Amino acid sequence: MSRRLIYVLNINRKSTHKIQENEIYTYFSYCNIDHTSTELDFVVKNYDLNRRQPVTGYTALHCYLYNNYFTNDVLKVLLNHGVDVTIKPSSGHMPIYILLTRCCNISHNVVIDMINKDKTHLSHKDYSNLLLEYIKSRYMLLKEEDIDENIVSTLLDKGIDPNFKQDGYTALHYYYLCLAHVYKPGECRKPITIKKAKRIISLFIQHGANLNALDNCGNTPFHLYLSIEMCNNIHMTKMLLTFNPNFEICNNHGLTPILCYITSDYIQHDILVMLIHHYETNVGEMPIDERRMIVFEFIKTYSTRPLDSITYLMNRFKNIDIHTRYEGKTLLHIACEYNNTHVIDYLIRINGDINALTDNNKHAIQLIIDNKENSQYTIDCLLYILRYIVDKNVIRSLVDQLPYLPIFDIKSFEKFISYCILLDDTFYDRHVQNRDSKTYRYTFSKYISFDKYDSIITKCYEETILLKLSTVLDTTLYSVLRCHNSRKLKRYLSVLKKYNNDKSFKIYSNIMNERYLNVYYKDMYVSKVYDKLFPVFTDKKCLLTLLPSEIIYEILYMLTIYDLYNISYPPTKV
């Protein structure tokens, strides 16, 4: 839709009549001016363009540079009719400053014209922040505006110091922030090509820019780039690494660039691998404290491929294992505390001890409950690790805290209750004893009504009675579901499959299915590994031939499904 022109001037007046200042202010500040218009021609010939307003000190040039309908063509007309580009208004900002920080779609040619009209060299203190403010404006205000490579080159060639600091930042700090935010969801920024970004950074370096300059928080530009959540592009990051930023500089929080990335709340596996590889190739072996911190901080963070990343880190840093502690906690403690189920699963596969206590005697379950920031995932994470908990005292302690657990999904909570009743024989009896207590009832008021809670427990308990009455060979279905030994459960596999389809079990069907699948896959992979290693077991030169096959099966059952899978299908090395 075309804009309607606003006419505020009477161009038919006699040339001897004075144009009022408020007319000029309105005209240049708010009107959509056509550079070929009779109006503009009338104004530039009949008005002193360098007359300053009493309060603001603005001239016609200042007013037009703040006009939302700014065009390069009108600015050229003003420059050709002798506007003074050196006049400072009360704000203290020179016209070239306003042009570079306020105007959109500015032409490199008008920038050169304005600079050439000013005889002062750009190295003068009045212009020292010009390049920094130009790039800063594209980062903070004019987000859809491009950073013109030619303008950057001209400003640097004219003597602007690329290392000038304002509020601790250099122009490169702001440029790296622009590069990071281009990829941030919802920013709607103009894309910056990698080739262009590389040329601009090269221009800075050619003019003596310090690539590792520190801001007030001790961050280099590369620190800032890596710390922006959800915005790092692998190809852009790879390009920035070609300038060999210093990986050993710690900011005021003790974080190197890699640690800034690890703590950014969003990690791409490929970028993590690239950063570590670059460090080890160009710097050398990473200090043990930094390695430890990388692994522990990674577990707290969202990542695109958590299993791949934790496997890579554990294999890369050989002196960090499941027993390593940082601030009194093992890797598994941190994984539980931050509800990182992918990492929990991996660490338990490689024999991490879920029942180990922290240095201040806290169990993993307590760490999950205490982390209020992740309260919406508390129940799901507790459900996830309950399959690994066998200590009855730990389960009883968890049951005692049930009234205080945050409930966001009633189905997950119901499943959680069913696990607790299955694993703790005393749960239902203790609940019945306290049922009439007002204090006990009141503790449930925050997340769920007591009646709802009581009905869930009653339903679960009634179904456990049915489990106890259901015979499975020489035992009951109740005992089978409480058993964690997949070797023992193998003999009940076919019965579990039958009960798995039994519609009479509405609450415990999920647990039956989990038990069945766990035993099924364990048995399947044990058989695969046994068949694969059979030539070894039967080789007369091998001492394993002395062992009965039953013992070999027992040994294989000690391995996790993950281990058995990797033996059956070894990962291919690229």
Swiss-Prot record:
ANK repeats lie at residues 56-87, 135-164, 167-213, 217-249, 253-285, 327-356. Keywords: ANK repeat, Repeat. Pfam families: Ank, Ank_3, PRANC. It comes from the Viruses. Residues 541-574 form the F-box domain. This is Ankyrin repeat protein B18.
